[in-house]
C-alpha cells in the first residue's frame, strides 16, 4: 500500500518544524493525515485566457477541503503567444513550457504534495503541466479556463465571425481601411478565455479529454458560461476520490501514467488529426510522452495521419465554425464518437472518471446519450457580451448540432476529406520529418514546387513579404528558428498572416525549422528536423533552389544533387565555430535562452532537453 507523500512532512517528532510551518498556513491537528492536494493555478492579468482564473483556484480548493483533503494553491507563469509574437518576446514562449514543468515539479516535490488539480488554459501552460504530471505520476485532474467566445461584427452590412488571426491579417492588409481594421481589432477578442478557434490552447485542452485526464466538455465549453463552473467543482471533489483510490486502495489506475498510456496518446493524436488541430500539439504530445516514458514517436504520428479522416473543420481553417460551434455539435466526445463508430480508436483506455471509452461515450456522446443534463451542457452557447469574468452568462443554443452530413462535426462517410487534418512529410529537406496542417491547405496546393527565397530570421522574412520581394510561386524558407537555432522555436504566424495580407496566402509555400501558431493556415510546413542549427539540410538551401512538396505522397525534397549538397556542407564546416549559425542575423540572446538552447533537441523529439547531455 503506498504511503501518502505528505506524511514525510506531517508525521514524526523530527518533523515538528515542518508541522509548525504547516500550522502557520492554517492547518490544524485534524488536517495532518489528510491528503495534501496542490491546486496548480496559472492566473495572470497578462493573458486573456488566464485573466479570469484568480478565484477558480479557491473554488477548487473549497471542494477539496469539503471532500476531506487539504488544498494548497500555487501559481505558474503563463506567456501569451499572441502578445509575445512578432518581436523578441516569442523566443521565450516554448522555453516557458520547460520552466512551467520544472516549477510544478519543484513545488510539488519540495512540499511532498499527494496529488494535483491543474488549472491551465493557454498554449504552453497545458503542455508544461502535462509534462510535469507524467513526470511526477501522482493523481491529477486537468480543468482549463475554457475558450473565448468568437468575435462578431458587421462590415458592409454583413455579420461576420472573427478571431485574433483576423485582426492580424486585416491589420496588415493595405486594401482594408483604417476604420474597418480598427473595428475588427475591437471585435476579434470579446471575452476572457483561450482564443476562439482550433488554435494551440484549445487543441491541447481538447487532447486532455482524449488522454483521459480531464472531464468531458473541458476543451470546448466556453469560459464565460455558467456550466463551466461545474467542471471546477467536480474536479475538486473527484481529485480527492482519485487520491484515496491510489493511496488507500492501492489502485494504480488512478495514476496519470496508467491513464495516459500509449493507447491514449494514439487516441489523442487521432482526435487532433480528425479535428485539424494545431501543429504544436505534435510537439507537445511528443514531449509529454517522453516525460511519461511512453513509446510514442513521430513514426506513430505518421502512421496515424494516413488512416484518419478530417471530421471537424474550425477556424482558422474556416470562418464558419469556432469552438462554441464545436461544443454545440458535441465537443470532443462528439468527435470521438464518430471516430469510434469508424473503428479508429483504441477502446481499452480509462479516464479520471473511472470509465472506459465505450462507457464514457455512452454517457457523453450527444449522438448516444440519453442524459438530458449532458445534452443541456452541450447546448451552452455564447452571450455576445464583452467580459473578463468566468461563468458570467447562461445562454443556450436552441438545439444541438447533430447534423453529421453538413454540420460542424461530420461522420466518416461525410468527412471534409478522407485525409486527416495533419500530415508528417519527409524527404531530403526533412530527414527526420516535418509537419503540415493539411486542414488549412487549399486543394490546389497539395502538390507544389517553386524556387526558394531564403531568410535566416522571421524578421527578415516579414520585411521581404511586406516589401514585395516574395512573389507568387515562391517557397519561403525561414531557418535558424528551431529550438536550438532561434533559440526557442518561434511561431511564424506573422509571416503566414502577411502572405495572406499581400494576396499570396494560396500562391506561396512557407517552410521553417520553427513552428506555427495554431492560428496558421495555408501551405505552412514547420518543425523541419533536423533543424539548421543541428546540421539539417534546410541550412544548405540557397536562393533559387527548387523545392518540391507532395502532401498526398508525404514528401518534401530539395531538388539539389548529393554532390552539390556535400560541397555546401563542407563550406559550412569550414566556418569553424560559426558553422550552422546564421551569417548576418543581429539578435540579442539572453543567458536564460542560451541555457535552454544548449540542451534543446529538434522538433521530432518534442524540443525537450537532451537528457544524454546531463548523463540521463
Curated annotation (Swiss-Prot):
Cofactor requirement: [2Fe-2S] cluster; Mg(2+)
Residues binding Mg(2+), per UniProt: 81, 123-124, 491
GO BP term, pick one: L-valine biosynthetic process
MF-aspect GO terms: 2 iron, 2 sulfur cluster binding; dihydroxy-acid dehydratase activity; magnesium ion binding
The record's free-text note on cofactor binding: Binds 1 [2Fe-2S] cluster per subunit. This cluster acts as a Lewis acid cofactor.
Pfam families cross-referenced by the UniProt entry: ILV_EDD_C, ILVD_EDD_N
Catalytic residues as annotated in Swiss-Prot or TrEMBL: 517
GO cellular component terms attached to this protein's record: cytosol
Keyword hit for Iron-sulfur: yes
Protein residues bound to [2Fe-2S] cluster: 122, 195
UniProt superkingdom: Bacteria
EC id: 4.2.1.9
Matching SUPFAM superfamilies: IlvD/EDD N-terminal domain-like (SSF143975), LeuD/IlvD-like (SSF52016)
Pathway: Amino-acid biosynthesis; L-isoleucine biosynthesis; L-isoleucine from 2-oxobutanoate: step 3/4; Amino-acid biosynthesis; L-valine biosynthesis; L-valine from pyruvate: step 3/4
Chemical reaction(s) catalysed: (2R)-2,3-dihydroxy-3-methylbutanoate = 3-methyl-2-oxobutanoate + H2O; (2R,3R)-2,3-dihydroxy-3-methylpentanoate = (S)-3-methyl-2-oxopentanoate + H2O
This protein's UniProt keywords: 2Fe-2S, Amino-acid biosynthesis, Branched-chain amino acid biosynthesis, Iron, Iron-sulfur, Lyase, Magnesium, Metal-binding
Subunit text: Homodimer.
Known role: Functions in the biosynthesis of branched-chain amino acids. Catalyzes the dehydration of (2R,3R)-2,3-dihydroxy-3-methylpentanoate (2,3-dihydroxy-3-methylvalerate) into 2-oxo-3-methylpentanoate (2-oxo-3-methylvalerate) and of (2R)-2,3-dihydroxy-3-methylbutanoate (2,3-dihydroxyisovalerate) into 2-oxo-3-methylbutanoate (2-oxoisovalerate), the penultimate precursor to L-isoleucine and L-valine, respectively.
Family per similarity comment: Belongs to the IlvD/Edd family.
Protein name: Dihydroxy-acid dehydratase
Protein source organism: Proteus mirabilis (strain HI4320)
Upper classification of the organism: Bacteria, Pseudomonadati, Pseudomonadota, Gammaproteobacteria, Enterobacterales
Encoding gene, per UniProt annotation: ilvD
Amino acid at each position: 500500500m503506498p504511503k501518502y507523500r505528505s506524511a514525510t512532512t506531517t508525521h514524526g517528532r523530527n518533523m515538528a518544524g515542518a508541522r509548525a510551518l504547516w500550522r502557520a498556513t492554517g492547518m490544524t491537528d485534524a488536517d495532518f493525515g489528510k491528503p495534501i492536494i496542490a491546486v496548480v493555478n496559472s492566473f495572470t492579468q497578462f493573458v486573456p485566457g488566464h485573466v479570469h482564473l484568480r478565484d477558480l483556484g479557491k473554488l477548487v480548493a473549497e471542494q477539496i477541503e469539503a471532500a476531506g483533503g487539504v488544498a494548497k494553491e500555487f501559481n505558474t507563469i503563463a506567456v501569451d503567444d499572441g502578445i509575445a509574437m512578432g518581436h523578441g518576446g516569442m523566443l521565450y514562449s516554448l522555453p516557458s513550457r520547460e520552466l512551467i514543468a520544472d516549477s510544478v515539479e519543484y513545488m510539488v516535490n519540495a512540499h511532498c504534495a499527494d496529488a494535483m488539480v491543474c488549472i491551465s488554459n493557454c498554449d504552453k501552460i497545458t503542455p508544461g503541466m502535462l509534462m510535469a504530471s507524467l513526470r511526477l505520476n501522482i493523481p491529477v485532474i486537468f480543468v482549463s479556463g475554457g475558450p473565448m467566445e468568437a468575435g462578431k461584427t458587421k462590415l458592409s452590412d454583413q455579420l461576420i465571425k472573427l478571431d485574433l488571426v483576423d485582426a492580424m491579417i486585416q491589420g496588415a492588409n493595405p486594401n482594408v481601411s483604417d476604420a474597418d481594421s480598427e473595428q475588427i481589432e475591437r471585435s476579434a477578442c470579446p471575452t476572457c478565455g483561450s482564443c476562439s478557434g482550433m488554435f494551440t490552447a484549445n487543441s491541447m485542452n481538447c487532447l486532455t479529454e482524449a488522454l483521459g485526464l480531464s472531464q468531458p466538455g473541458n476543451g470546448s465549453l466556453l469560459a464565460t458560461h455558467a456550466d463551466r463552473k461545474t467542471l471546477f467543482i467536480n474536479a475538486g471533489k473527484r481529485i480527492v476520490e482519485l487520491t484515496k483510490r491510489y493511496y488507500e486502495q492501492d489502485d494504480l489506475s488512478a495514476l496519470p501514467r496508467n491513464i495516459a498510456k500509449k493507447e491514449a496518446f494514439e487516441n489523442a493524436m487521432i482526435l487532433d488529426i480528425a479535428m485539424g488541430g494545431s501543429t504544436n500539439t505534435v510537439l507537445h504530445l511528443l514531449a509529454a510522452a517522453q516525460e511519461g516514458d511512453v513509446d510514442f514517436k513521430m513514426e506513430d504520428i505518421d502512421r496515424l495521419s494516413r488512416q484518419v479522416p478530417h471530421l471537424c473543420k474550425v477556424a482558422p481553417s474556416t470562418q464558419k465554425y469556432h469552438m462554441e460551434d464545436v461544443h454545440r455539435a458535441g465537443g470532443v466526445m462528439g468527435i470521438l464518437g464518430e471516430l469510434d463508430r469508424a473503428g479508429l480508436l483504441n477502446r481499452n483506455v480509462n479516464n479520471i472518471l473511472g470509465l472506459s471509452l465505450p462507457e464514457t461515450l455512452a454517457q457523453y456522446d450527444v449522438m448516444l446519450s440519453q442524459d438530458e443534463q449532458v445534452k443541456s451542457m452541450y447546448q451552452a452557447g455564447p452571450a455576445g457580451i464583452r467580459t473578463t469574468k468566468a461563468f458570467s452568462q447562461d445562454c443556450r443554443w436552441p438545439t444541438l448540432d447533430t447534423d453529421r452530413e453538413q454540420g460542424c462535426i461530420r461522420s466518416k462517410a461525410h468527412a471534409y476529406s478522407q485525409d486527416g487534418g495533419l500530415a508528417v512529410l519527409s524527404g531530403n529537406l526533412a530527414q527526420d520529418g516535418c509537419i503540415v496542417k493539411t486542414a488549412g491547405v487549399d486543394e490546389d496546393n497539395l502538390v507544389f514546387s517553386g524556387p526558394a527565397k531564403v531568410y535566416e530570421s522571421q524578421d527578415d522574412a516579414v520585411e521581404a513579404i511586406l516589401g514585395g520581394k516574395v512573389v507568387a510561386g515562391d517557397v519561403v524558407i525561414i531557418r535558424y528558428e528551431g529550438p536550438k537555432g532561434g533559440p526557442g522555436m518561434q511561431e511564424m504566424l506573422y509571416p503566414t498572416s502577411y502572405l495572406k495580407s499581400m494576396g499570396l496566402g494560396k500562391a506561396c509555400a512557407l517552410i521553417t525549422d520553427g513552428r506555427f501558431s495554431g492560428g496558421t493556415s495555408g501551405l505552412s510546413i514547420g518543425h523541419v528536423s533536423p533543424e539548421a542549427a543541428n546540421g539539417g539540410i534546410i541550412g544548405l538551401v540557397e536562393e533559387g533552389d527548387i523545392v518540391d512538396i507532395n502532401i498526398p505522397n508525404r514528401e518534401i525534397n530539395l531538388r539539389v544533387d548529393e554532390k552539390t549538397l556535400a560541397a555546401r556542407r563542407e563550406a559550412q564546416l569550414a566556418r569553424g565555430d560559426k558553422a550552422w549559425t546564421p551569417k548576418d542575423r543581429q539578435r540579442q540572446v539572453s543567458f536564460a535562452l542560451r541555457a535552454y538552447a544548449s540542451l534543446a533537441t529538434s522538433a521530432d523529439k518534442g524540443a525537450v532537453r537532451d537528457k544524454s547531455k546531463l548523463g540521463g
